[in-house]
Every structure is written in C-alpha cells, then in structure tokens.
Amino acid sequence: MVLPVADLPDDVDALKAMILAMAKERAANEARLAAAAAEVARLKAVEKSANERIANLTSILKVLQRTQHGTRSERLRLAVNDEQVSFAFEEVETGLSEIQSELNRAAGDKPKRAPRPRKGFAAHLERIEEVIEPEVPADCAGLEKVLIGEDRSERLDVVPPKFRVIVTRRPKYAFRGRDGVVQALAPAHLIESGLPTERLLAYIAVSKYADGLPLYRQEAIYLRDGVEVSRSLMAQWMGHLGFELQMLADYILERVKEGERVFADETTLPTLAPGSGKTTKAWLWAYARDDRPYGGTSPPMVAYRFEDGRGADCVARHLAGFSGILQVDGYSAYTNLAKARAKTGSNETIQLAGCWAHLRRKFYDLHISGVSQAATDSIIAMTELWRLEDEVRGKDAASRAELRQEKSSAIVASLFELWEKELGKVSGKSKTAEAIRYALTRREALERFLTDGRIEIDSNIVERAIRPQTITRKNSLFAGSEGGGRTWATVATLLQTCKMNGVDPLDWLSQTLTRIAQGWPASEIEALMPWNFKPDAIG
C-alpha cells in the first residue's frame, strides 16, 4: 500500500513506527503465502498419491466387475469363486474409503453436501432414544421453551454377546400338621448336571458349523470375558448335540429323497486317524433339494453325510429309496450308481443330469490362456445359455422346457457340432481335447435339461451348500475324528437348511434343543423342521 506524502507523519519516531509496522505486515503476508504454497504442495502430493492408489484399485475393480458384467466373452461369474470375488470387492471398497477419508482430512473444512438417501434400518431392531438438549442462551434464562420440531438421525450400534448365569432356585416347603415336602421339578436340560443352557449349546454350534469359528478360537474369545470353557469340553457337548440331532438330520435326508430331482456333490474333510495323529482324507457328501427354480412349493433343504471313502457304495447307501433325476458333476460314482440300478432292473431308476458349470470351467481356462479359439467360442455360446436361463427361472417346468426347446437347443447342438469337429484337429493329449471329451462322453446328461424343465442348467444349488463347509474346514484344519465328522454332517445339515429357508439358525437351534430336552415326541418331528419354525414360539 502506497500512502500520499501528505499523509506521512512529520515526527521521525512516528514515521519509524509506521515503517516498522508495514515491514511486519509484509513479513506476515509473505509467511502466509509461504504457508499457503506449502499447503498447496502438500495437497498436490496427497492428491497424486490418492490418484495413483485409486487408479490401482479401479483397475482391480474393473477386473472384478467382469465377473458379472462386460461382453459375453469377458464374463467370468460362473468360473470365479463367489467368496473370493466378494472378499476382493470388500478389500477394494475398504481401500477406496480410506483414500476418501484421507482426502477429506486434507481438504479440511468444506461445505457439507446433502446426505444421500439410504435405506432405513430394520424395524425389529431395538431403538435406544438419546435426546440432546441445547444449552439455554443467557438472555433466555427463565423463559418457557416451546418445541417447534427436531432433527432425527439413526446410527447402527452393536452390543457384543454377553455371558450371563441363569440361577434356578427351587424352594422346598413343608406344611404344619402335614408330613412331606413339596418342591418343583428341576427343568430338563440336554446336558444334565452340566454347565450350559440350550442357547449356549446352540451358540457354540452355530459359531462352529455355520460361521466357521473353530472351538479353539471360541475358547480364546470367551476367555476375554473371563469365562473358562475348554475346547475339549465344548467338543464333548457338540458330540452330545450330534447324537440328539441325528434323527432330525436323517429325516431331512428322507425328505430330500422324496424330491423329483436331487443335487449331489462331495468335498474332502480331513480327519485325524486314531492313534497315529496323522490326518486321513474323509469325505462330506451333500444332497440338496430345491424346487423353487421351476415353481415348486416344497421347502429347500440339504443333507450331509460323512464317509471315509468316495466310492459308489457310499452314494448308493445314501440314496437308497430314491428314484428320479440326480443332477451332478461328472464324477464316476454317480454314473456307476445309475448303471447299476439300470442293470438290475431296479424300480428305483436314476436319470443323470449334467452340470454345465463344471464343463464351462474347463473351457474357460483355455479361453483365458488364449490357446483355443474353439474354447472362446464355447464360452460365448454358453454365456447365452445362462442368459436364457435367467428368463425361465421360477416358471413352471413346462414353460421352461418350451423356451429351452425354442432357443437353447440350437445353441447346444451347435456346441456339440463345434466340439466334434475340433476334436479331430487338436492333439489328443491337449487340454482342449480333454475338455471336449469331457463334454462328448456326457452329452446325454448335459442335454437332458433341454426337455425337462425340472432340471437346472448347473448344480450350483448344491455347490452353494458345500461352500460354507469348505470355509469351516479351512478354518478348522480337520474334523478331529470320525465321530467329529459325523457330528459335523449332522449339525451342518440342520443349520444350512435353516439358511436356505431364511431362518435364523441360532433361534431355531435354541428352540429345538429346548423342545428335545423337554421330551418332544418323535411322531411330531415335522414340526421341528426349520421350514416350520415360528420365531414367536421361542421360550
């Protein structure tokens, strides 16, 4: 700022003071400019770092999005493990949120934008009202307050599971002038003279067999709350639980076999060999029934069976009494069972239906590696098959078969024509030839869905039932023993069936264990099934 000469003071000291003040102001301005320049440089550095990380995460996100979207040749959703994809999406979202928080912090105060509308929390959740009253201004002290409105917001909170002790007191009474004593009977419990309530047993079982939390981890978690329950004791409780629930699991398997179409699959379940301390390979077989895709009204369910082998004798024993469609992958045990039944002229006939998802995976690997144009063409055609399946899902069997005959059959015919031609062009030892032979040798089973609307294009229903058990297996390392494997199969049967029916497994199991302890009659076992569960009946 330049002052006119006339405005300058005549006094030397005053003039010096003015000059000194102007110098200080200039220095302060320069300091502010330097600080602003430093802040700009810092923000640019933060922005550059954020942009680099965003670009990296965005590239990952694009790859993941191709698992569900993209061109037909790029879609991967049937070849990628759903759990892996979900986990990757979660990690990307977490990374992006961290960057956004960093940018918000770097930007400091900024105008608040209008909040995005969001879906409210479920109505059944408990609401804890917290009213925050404003401070009364000094000049309004003593005046009457008039409520003219309020702002209301909700945040989701959690109360971690808390242990408590149920103290049961049963007073004894005597009557003057009369002999004897009266006292109420002790309530029945599944573990007599033991520590746990039925709800604690249910909580441990759901944590282990539904949520994949091994007993040794539960032991450590409970210790944080000062509760000492050893894993060996919990294992004993689970064994008793398996014994009590076996009848229910057997009943579900029988209900599964009443279906017109059953899905089957199997997965390994390592088990400790007696005496040696080494793990041996055992198997968890799964049999699922779900008629909803073709408009059926029967409840969905799954039954698991533990075996130390994987032979055809296992599946023959499990499916004794079943006659109908068996939808499976290409494993020979199922084929051998169907052939054996046909050879003996059994009334319990089995029609095998193939799984196009298993076949697709074989061609998908070749498509990704770029070694086979036929594989890429196959993937494109198969993607169209699944798109057509989306159109018929939930319709009745006749409508499904009609649309498949109209649109899908030509695609399937062209695929088998392509594979037959390609097989003569490639090396018999190549992966392409291996994939083609897999398809050609199972052609009848793979084509069966075209004429029967009850059949699905894949066996993903049972694969989804197997997946939670593979997660539990990974976390637990092994089943512990043959008895532990049987208990696993029994409890998992019931808890997974709960999930398939949209029932809270903890509420169902708590109620069911209480009823069993109280002597629920075996003749009314149907009322205990997850699909008949009524939450308001919990005691």
UniProtKB/Swiss-Prot annotation:
<keyword id="KW-0614">Plasmid</keyword>
<dbReference type="Pfam" id="PF13005">
    <property type="entry name" value="zf-IS66"/>
</dbReference>
<dbReference type="Pfam" id="PF13007">
    <property type="entry name" value="LZ_Tnp_IS66"/>
</dbReference>
<protein>
    <recommendedName>
        <fullName>Uncharacterized protein y4qI</fullName>
    </recommendedName>
</protein>
<dbReference type="InterPro" id="IPR052344">
    <property type="entry name" value="Transposase-related"/>
</dbReference>
<dbReference type="Pfam" id="PF03050">
    <property type="entry name" value="DDE_Tnp_IS66"/>
</dbReference>
<dbReference type="InterPro" id="IPR004291">
    <property type="entry name" value="Transposase_IS66_central"/>
</dbReference>
<dbReference type="Pfam" id="PF13817">
    <property type="entry name" value="DDE_Tnp_IS66_C"/>
</dbReference>
<dbReference type="InterPro" id="IPR024474">
    <property type="entry name" value="Znf_dom_IS66"/>
</dbReference>
<dbReference type="InterPro" id="IPR024463">
    <property type="entry name" value="Transposase_TnpC_homeodom"/>
</dbReference>
<comment type="similarity">
    <text>Belongs to the transposase 25 family.</text>
</comment>
<dbReference type="InterPro" id="IPR039552">
    <property type="entry name" value="IS66_C"/>
</dbReference>
